Amino acid sequence: MGRSLKKGPYVDPKLLKKIRELNEKGEKKIIKTWSRRSVIVPEMVGHTIAVYNGRKHIPVYITENMIGHRLGEFAPTRTFTGHRIPTARITAIK
């Protein structure tokens, strides 16, 4: 189930405060955050937010197409290295 419409989208209060301060000053700095669950709102457009993926912060530039999605969607947490090839097949190929 999604979040109730009467509550509105969840945005981490500290992150929203930082965004509003930068908008007032007219600055564009990279903002580090651990809040992957925060929803992208129109105030964030044009900013770069470094989202933590469990190992490092991934810089995400916010565009209009991202509004309504969550920050965590743009910072993958798992690295896929591919499936293992059986050793018998490797020797047959050579």
Curated annotation (Swiss-Prot):
GO terms for biological process: ribosomal small subunit assembly; translation. Gene3D superfamilies: 30s Ribosomal Protein S19, Chain A. GO terms for molecular function: rRNA binding; structural constituent of ribosome. Transmembrane segments: none annotated. GO terms for cellular component: cytoplasm; small ribosomal subunit. Keywords: Ribonucleoprotein, Ribosomal protein, RNA-binding, rRNA-binding. The keyword Ribosomal protein applies. PANTHER family: RIBOSOMAL PROTEIN S19P FAMILY MEMBER, SMALL RIBOSOMAL SUBUNIT PROTEIN US19M. Protein S19 forms a complex with S13 that binds strongly to the 16S ribosomal RNA. HAMAP family: Ribosomal_uS19. Belongs to the universal ribosomal protein uS19 family. This is Small ribosomal subunit protein uS19. It comes from Dictyoglomus turgidum (strain DSM 6724 / Z-1310).
